[in-house]
Amino acid sequence: MSEKIISVAVSGYFDPIHVGHLDYLEHAKKLGDKLIVIVNNNHQCVLKKGKPFMDELDRVRIVKSLDMVDEVFLSVDSDRSVCKSLEEIKPDIFANGGDRFESDSPESGICKKFKIKMVDGLGEKIRSSSSLTGLKEIK
């Protein structure tokens, strides 16, 4: 009988991708066997910062090319969360980056519902995409 493959999901805008994202993805990959990256869609970028710096399909293509990534999933959500995407994927683990924690995560409810383990604080907050592009997050 074969062992269960542990799937780890992470999410991000990757707009643009930077070294902090790579650190986050490398740490997440170590948590399981299969790394699934949810890339936030263009609509979510508009909600966060007014407009995407890069198109969602370009961001998906770049993330797919990374060695540590096993699968890329374009977010199906219409708000800033990835709750619906997690409901579709149903990974074993949902990992947040260094600047996100379960206590402030909109995904915590869906993770409890589907018994998805949450892991927080992966990688350091080295820099932000908005600091690279000059685009500011909309609060």
Model-predicted regions and their roles:
Residues M1-K139:
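Nucleotidyltransferase catalytic core that binds NTPs
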